[in-house]
């Protein structure tokens, strides 16, 4: 152990002149012209997920799957330990990239090809990197669209998550620019166009049958079913600390002075970070759908169609798009269930279904060509695929 003397220090402020010519105003994030196709950003900061953080996320966001709550249950199914929720892994990976990717963003346009490729356990440390796939510049006065691929690595530099998203960003147009973290040439970026899931040898313990509801096995799900989830979740100012807990640095989500300077539906007050809304919606579906999920096969075509604010109550509806018997492909009897999740705000899911019916399941961006109006109560839409245990 190194021992270094540390004497009390004297006050300096009262006798130190103020130097107005040495003022620093660090600016974070990138404008549209600061992105170049093919660049790779290594994002600052890493996050170690301890056991308490993992369980707190799962319970705060209402996930009922015992894999994220019980080490004994997870180990009995062949995993090394309790799993970190896939939504927590996704939120951390996205949030670590905000400073480089989207801190100047006007909006997140969509999530695509989200793939969870390896288990994440308590005490794992996650880092993230982003590759710029495409920059669509629509002119000086219009926001452009930046398409990115982000990967998330654990402390062994193993790929645990890969996903893509599109971000709407303005050009600087005279606004002061920052000095974003430089691009790393020849950065290690183990992306893959042919993702492979790496899981341990899974087991099917019978002693945990009572740990989950009997109506959430693969055999319970049929194409065409619609699950109207009966409980909502009122979002409070808790979203402020949770935004930073997962590493998101965009001031739109926690700075009232910043938000009050923005006009339009995204301005006036802090917007709840969309990844948290996504996690709450998935959590609300879990008792009906994913309680017996053994692995999250991913998400795609995810869109935040309206912002959420503190005080909003969010509700959810799930539609079963397809089911596929996977036999023993994963070592135990399972099946894949392809879902469409619809998020709503300030309306009960029952009332929304009665009021809007099949229009709920039509993409909001497709409404115009079908001669329909967008729904102000609808806040989110995404497709998800999950691997669910059979009854055994």
Language-model features, listed with the residues they occupy:
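Extended, hydrophobic interaction surfaces within ordered domains
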Residues: 1-4, 123-190
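Hot-dog-fold acyl-thioester-processing enzymes
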Residues: 2-109, 161, 171-299, 357-381
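Residue-level signal for secondary-structure boundary sites
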Residues: 138, 158, 171-173, 237, ...
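Short peripheral tails and domain-boundary helices/loops at the edges of structured domains
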Residues: 147-169, 335-383, 390
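Hydrophobic beta-sheet segments that form the core/acyl-binding groove
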Residues: 109-155, 300-348
């Amino acid at each position: 152990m190194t021992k270094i003397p540390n004497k009390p220090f004297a006050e300096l402020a009262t006798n130190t002149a103020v130097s107005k010519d040495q003022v620093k105003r660090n600016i974070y994030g990138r404008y549209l012209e600061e992105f170049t196709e093919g660049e790779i950003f290594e994002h600052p900061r890493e996050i170690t997920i301890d056991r308490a953080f993992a369980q707190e996320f799962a319970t705060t966001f209402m996930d009922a799957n015992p894999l994220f709550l019980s080490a004994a249950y997870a180990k009995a199914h062949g995993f090394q330990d309790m799993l970190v929720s896939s939504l927590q892994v996704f939120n951390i990976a996205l949030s670590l990239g905000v400073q480089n990717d989207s801190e100047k963003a006007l909006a997140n346009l969509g999530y695509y090809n989200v793939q969870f490729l390896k288990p994440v356990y308590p005490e794992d440390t996650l880092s993230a990197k982003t590759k710029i796939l495409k920059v669509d510049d629509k002119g000086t006065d219009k926001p452009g669209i930046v398409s990115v691929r982000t990967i998330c690595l654990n402390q062994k530099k193993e790929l645990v998550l890969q996903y893509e998203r599109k971000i709407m960003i303005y050009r600087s147009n005279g606004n002061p620019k920052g000095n974003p973290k430089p691009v790393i040439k020849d950065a290690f970026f183990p992306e893959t166009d042919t993702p492979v899931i790496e899981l341990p040898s899974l087991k099917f313990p019978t002693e945990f049958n009572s740990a989950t509801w009997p109506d959430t096995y693969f055999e319970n799900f049929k194409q065409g079913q619609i699950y109207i989830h009966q409980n909502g979740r009122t979002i409070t100012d808790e979203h402020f600390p949770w935004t930073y807990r997962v590493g998101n640095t965009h001031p739109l989500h926690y700075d009232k002075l910043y938000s009050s300077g923005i006009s339009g539906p995204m301005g006036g007050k802090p917007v709840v970070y969309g990844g948290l809304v996504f996690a709450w919606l998935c959590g609300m579906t879990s008792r009906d759908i994913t309680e017996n999920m053994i692995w999250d096969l991913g998400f795609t075509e995810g869109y935040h169609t309206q912002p959420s604010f503190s005080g909003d109550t969010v509700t959810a509806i799930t539609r079963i798009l397809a089911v596929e018997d996977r036999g023993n492909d994963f070592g135990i009897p399972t099946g894949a269930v392809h879902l469409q999740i619809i998020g709503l705000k300030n309306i009960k899911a029952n009332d929304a279904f009665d009021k809007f019916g099949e229009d709920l399941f039509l993409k909001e961006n497709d409404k115009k060509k079908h001669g329909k109006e967008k729904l102000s109560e609808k806040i989110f839409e995404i497709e998800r695929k999950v691997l669910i245990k059979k009854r055994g």
